[in-house]
């Protein structure tokens, strides 16, 4: 929860606690979850200190702000734990690129398809790129045909994220593993 600032480290405060709460009145919630009501901040801080706990501003946007009497270090630990679990559950796709030329031979194309299949089996997205140069641009249909051929050969394990599209001197196709799609 700290970040480096020129001159040293500064703690990033997401929540204002104890004497850092500067509003005159707060809506207080006890440590067991019962609503105490709107009271002066000094009184709320005294109640928290009497129980050896912290007064934490939970909802600063409310009028008056909602504060809770809790153990702040335990609260911070639980928040970090929730954030860590949320990061674990995120799906991370890595995009692997396979480049081909429009005049690729059949064997070389099979090797490229094999590489794409390995990437897809590994759970990654695959972006296929057909590179054109010079007068090859007049025959973009060759690149599109090659992309369609690759799409058909990998149809058992992947499906296209979107249609084959071209941008500049390239033609693109992005394939996503079927088991990753919901």
UniProtKB/Swiss-Prot annotation:
PROSITE patterns: IF3 (PS00938)
Role this protein plays: IF-3 binds to the 30S ribosomal subunit and shifts the equilibrium between 70S ribosomes and their 50S and 30S subunits in favor of the free subunits, thus enhancing the availability of 30S subunits on which protein synthesis initiation begins.
Tree of life domain: Bacteria
One GO cellular component, as annotated: membrane
The protein's name: Translation initiation factor IF-3
Keywords attached to this entry: Cytoplasm, Initiation factor, Protein biosynthesis
Lineage: Bacteria, Pseudomonadati, Elusimicrobiota, Endomicrobiia, Endomicrobiales
Record GO biological process: ribosome disassembly
The gene coding this protein: infC
Any GO MF annotation of the entry: translation initiation factor activity
Entry's family note: Belongs to the IF-3 family.
């Amino acid at each position: 929860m700290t970040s480096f600032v020129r001159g040293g480290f500064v703690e990033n405060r997401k929540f204002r606690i104890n004497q850092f709460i500067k509003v005159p009145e707060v809506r207080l919630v006890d440590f067991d979850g019962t609503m105490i009501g709107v009271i002066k901040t000094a009184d709320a801080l005294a109640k928290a200190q009497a129980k050896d706990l912290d007064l934490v501003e939970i909802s600063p946007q409310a009028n008056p702000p909602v504060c809770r009497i809790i153990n702040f270090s335990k609260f911070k630990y639980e928040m970090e734990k929730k954030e860590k679990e949320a990061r674990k559950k995120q799906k991370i796709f890595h995009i692997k690129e396979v480049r081909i030329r429009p005049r690729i031979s059949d064997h070389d194309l099979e090797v490229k398809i094999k590489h794409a299949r390995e990437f897809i089996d590994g759970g990654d997205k695959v972006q296929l790129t057909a590179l054109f140069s010079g007068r090859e641009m007049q025959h973009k249909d060759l690149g599109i045909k090659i992309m369609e051929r690759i799409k058909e050969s990998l149809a058992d394990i992947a499906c296209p994220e979107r249609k084959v599209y071209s941008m500049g001197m390239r033609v693109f196709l992005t394939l996503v593993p079927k088991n990753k799609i919901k």
